[in-house]
């Protein structure tokens, strides 16, 4: 349990939204630094925007946050913002997120891919889902996929699929990867309950995911919880 706490507490992903080179075109957005201390507030802002339909710009902020380390982060963010600035596209994006949150089928995942103009994407569409409902859904990227492949048996999930990855680690958005994500989601939900009970503090599936992400990056071994 202590290793889980250490991993979560040392998670330090920091993003300066001001660095988006199109920030001046979106007053009131892209104007703060996101750290673990205000990450939940950032998630909640996105959730409110989707539920109320008031500001597609919040989705652009989440996109920039996710692809911050990418060399083409500005282009990816601008493409999404241009796409969602069309009212019917923003409406479909909101519907797609709500639908997959209530019914996480592969078909609804494909719908979300299209809705966020990421027909070949995996990590970014799931980032929107995880931000929308962090009490149920974790994120997944190559670091998570690597950890899952190496550790799922240790934690009692050996019969479940691994993510299909390219040589560079990128997750291929196929049915097997989706099935692996559903198992990963179940694991995060299971461990959020165990950690909340054993740590006597609230852990969400998103918190479990962040601990795993940090552990994989720092080569920390996380113990199996009973």
Sequence positions of predicted segments:
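An N-terminal alpha-helical hairpin/helix-loop-helix interaction module that forms a charged
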Residues: 1-116, 134-226
């Amino acid at each position: 349990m202590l290793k889980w706490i250490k991993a979560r507490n040392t998670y330090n992903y920091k993003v300066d939204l001001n660095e988006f080179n199109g920030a001046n075109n979106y007053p009131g957005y892209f104007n703060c630094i996101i750290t673990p201390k205000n990450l939940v507030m950032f998630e909640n802002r996105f959730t409110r925007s989707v539920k109320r339909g008031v500001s597609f710009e919040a989705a652009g902020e989440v996109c920039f946050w996710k692809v911050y380390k990418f060399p083409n982060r500005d282009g990816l963010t601008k493409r999404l913002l241009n796409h969602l600035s069309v009212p019917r596209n923003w409406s479909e994006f909101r519907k797609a997120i709500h639908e997959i949150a209530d019914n996480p089928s592969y078909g609804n995942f494909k719908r979300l891919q299209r809705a966020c103009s990421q027909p070949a994407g995996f990590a970014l569409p799931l980032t929107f889902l995880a931000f929308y409902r962090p009490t149920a859904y974790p994120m997944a990227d190559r670091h998570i996929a690597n950890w899952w492949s190496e550790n799922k048996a240790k934690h009692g999930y050996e019969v479940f699929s691994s993510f299909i990855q390219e040589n560079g680690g990128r997750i291929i958005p196929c049915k097997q990867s989706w099935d692996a994500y559903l198992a990963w989601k179940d694991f995060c939900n299971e461990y959020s309950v165990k950690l909340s009970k054993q740590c006597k503090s609230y852990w969400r599936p998103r918190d479990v995911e962040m601990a795993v992400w940090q552990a994989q990056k720092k080569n920390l071994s996380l113990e199996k919880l009973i």
